[in-house]
Amino acid sequence: MTHIISMERLEETVFRSGGSGDNWHMTWAEDDLQYVGLCDGQGWPEMAGYVRKERGYNSRIYAIRGDPPDIRFIHLPGFPDLLSEEAPNVNRYYGFGIIALGSCIYQFLSTPNHPFTSGPDPRFVGAKLIYSQDLGKSWLNQDGSPVHWEPWAARSRANMVFLNEPGETFSLLTVVQMGRNYQHNRDGYVYVCAPNGNVEGSMNQLVMFRAPRERLLERASYEFFVSRRRDGSARWSSDISARGSVHTFPAGWVNTKLHPYAWHPSVTYNAPLGLYLMANWGMGCDANGMWFGKPSYLGFWIAPNPWGPWEQVHEETAWMPEGDANARAYQPQICPRWIAEDGKPFWLAYTDFQPQQPRYCFNCQKVLIRTR
């Protein structure tokens, strides 16, 4: 595994796409497009086929063509509308983990326990799995039926791939990326990671499951990481209660006000350097535990395997793109198509929670890796 000396965000390269939205989990498909999830935004009005919605989209998928700064977002008309609604937000989901395998695209959408604006202790407690067999032209539920956005009362383990699991684990999912069309995968498994819960002490623990790539729709095929052996190989179990922690992130970066939201990673195989690269973030809280009270934590880690062991190679306890002390950056996403041929520069997408435009949008910045 390549030895990394340092990493640097290149401030002069910050690119803001316009439009609005956040989170930006993405995958690189066989058609050479990246497919990206948007949450809570209007998208890009200049897109062909764009239809403005009064309150915007709760969650949607778009395609991306090109390289920064010359990129174009592509509207996918076949994605079922999931709109931001007035309270009580009857159909609210958040599209996060995504993976392209051949002509199929799979996406995990996280479900809260109830609308964030009503009821006590709002938090993410599960995930719905949908998929497309034709690179985003049409979409199906996990059971093969047309996508239906179940309202709160209708969500159950019959239609959610995870729901109210032990410790509320596997509610914020990230799929490990391995190049265009998953081409760098060698063992036939898809790897998915997540925070282990919703409170300090569990949310900063990383857990993982794997599934054969042809059986990702079958919850019964999932194996959960238990531990690493001395030789670096992993123990797996079909019992979610036997899960172990892949890695533990620093304490003190989980909010207690509004819904807990932190330590939701991005993991991508960097083929030129022969290592897995992870970006992750912690929530900057004020003295009362309110989210976005100060700049976020940003870190990068590397590992020889998806299950680690993970070594930290970069840390910022005040993540401030362009040196802006008002920045409230979050959800760093390693863009899998935008890794250079030598693996050293790559592009990192993120959102900034500052209310003014153009920061609440698809921002990206080049990051430079220095090696020995």
PLM features: what roles do these ranges have?
Residues 334-372:
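Blade-level signature of beta-propeller repeat domains, shared across WD40, Kelch, NHL, RCC1
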